[in-house]
């Protein structure tokens, strides 16, 4: 029966045939269906596939990453001269940091001999120096499950004693703190790239307006210790500031490595001299 009609059959022809032939309801419906244009085969297949593919489900839980890490790519040092002054810009690793249950306070003299290890070999060929800028940035290398916090601040009076608590350290100029697993957004300061957002960076910069001298003599850590052993106030004419760092709040009595502290700086090197004569 389905072959009696096709889609070009006119409705009045169907009515004439129905009048002459007694059809069942099913046969009549099939005959009418055969007169309708068939939908494209491609669309029919698409509908069947859509009906067979189950709808994806979405979970409503978002987990924070457990592992933390940053890709450090230090650029080569940049050296240039202006008049009688040599200007050097670079970034280098300052120190490795770890955390324990108890608070551990350390300090670093902000002078070429103690900032990293590379600068001292260069700066000893000049008699004096002056910081144009220097910034310390903490980058974590521990999981987000690591307990503890880092605290940093500057002391500009070298005759002052070191703080022994977070409360005392928090009063230092430029004080900054954060959990030991935080600070990735400070990577731009280390890699010397554009900083889109540093709101979560753990970083601190020396205020060069606070230093007591316009320029300082190049001295070793031993030279400094000898001088302040005679008079603590002498330190103010040898070193512009001291960086104080405290690590506390860990979950273990054994030190757990948390990250690294980098120093990025621009320094003016003044009056060249043979290193052997620079005493």
Curated annotation (Swiss-Prot):
SUPFAM superfamilies: Positive stranded ssRNA viruses
Residues annotated with N-acetylalanine modification: 20
Keyword Disulfide bond in annotation: yes
Stretches the record annotates as Disordered: 31-59
Domain of life: Viruses
Propeptide residue intervals: 1-19
Start and end residues of each stretch annotated as S domain, virion shell: 84-269
Recorded GO MF terms: calcium ion binding; lipid binding; RNA binding; structural constituent of virion
Disulfides per UniProt: 188-195
Keyword Disulfide bond: yes
Cellular component terms (Gene Ontology): T=3 icosahedral viral capsid
Biased composition (Basic residues): 40-50
Alphabetical list of InterPro entries matching this protein: Capsid_prot_S-dom_vir, Viral_coat
Keywords annotated in UniProt: Acetylation, Capsid protein, Disulfide bond, T=3 icosahedral capsid protein, Virion
Region (R domain, interaction with RNA): 20-83
Subunit-level organization: The virus particle has a shell of 180 protein subunits arranged with T=3 icosahedral symmetry around a core of RNA. Each icosahedral unit contains three protein subunits.
Family assignment from sequence similarity: Belongs to the icosahedral plant coat protein family.
Protein name: Capsid protein
Organism: Southern cowpea mosaic virus (SCPMV)
């Amino acid at each position: 029966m389905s072959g009696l009609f096709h889609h070009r059959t006119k409705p009045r022809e169907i009515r004439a045939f129905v009048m002459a032939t007694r059809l069942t309801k099913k046969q009549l419906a099939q005959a009418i269906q055969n007169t309708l244009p068939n939908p494209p085969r491609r669309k029919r297949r698409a509908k069947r596939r859509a009906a067979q593919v189950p709808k994806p489900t979405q979970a409503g839980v978002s987990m924070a990453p457990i592992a933390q890490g940053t890709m450090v790519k230090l650029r080569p040092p940049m050296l240039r001269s202006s008049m009688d002054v040599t200007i050097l810009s670079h970034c280098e690793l300052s120190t490795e940091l770890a955390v324990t249950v108890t608070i551990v306070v350390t300090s670093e003299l902000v002078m070429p001999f103690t900032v990293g290890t590379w600068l001292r070999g260069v700066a000893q060929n000049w008699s004096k120096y002056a910081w144009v800028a220097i910034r310390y940035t903490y980058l974590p290398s521990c999981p987000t499950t690591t307990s503890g916090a880092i605290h940093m601040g500057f002391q500009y009076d070298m005759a002052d004693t070191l703080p022994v608590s977070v409360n005392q350290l928090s009063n230092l100029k430029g004080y900054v703190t954060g959990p030991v697993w935080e600070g990735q957004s400070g990577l731009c300061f280390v890699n010397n790239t554009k900083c889109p957002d540093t709101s979560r960076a753990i970083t601190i910069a020396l205020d060069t307006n606070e230093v007591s001298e316009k320029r300082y003599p190049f001295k070793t850590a031993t030279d400094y210790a000898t001088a302040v052993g005679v008079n603590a106030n002498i330190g103010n004419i040898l070193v512009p500031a001291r960086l104080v760092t405290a690590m506390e709040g860990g979950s273990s009595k054994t030190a757990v490595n948390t990250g690294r502290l980098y120093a990025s700086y621009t320094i003016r090197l003044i009056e060249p001299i043979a290193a052997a004569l620079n005493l």
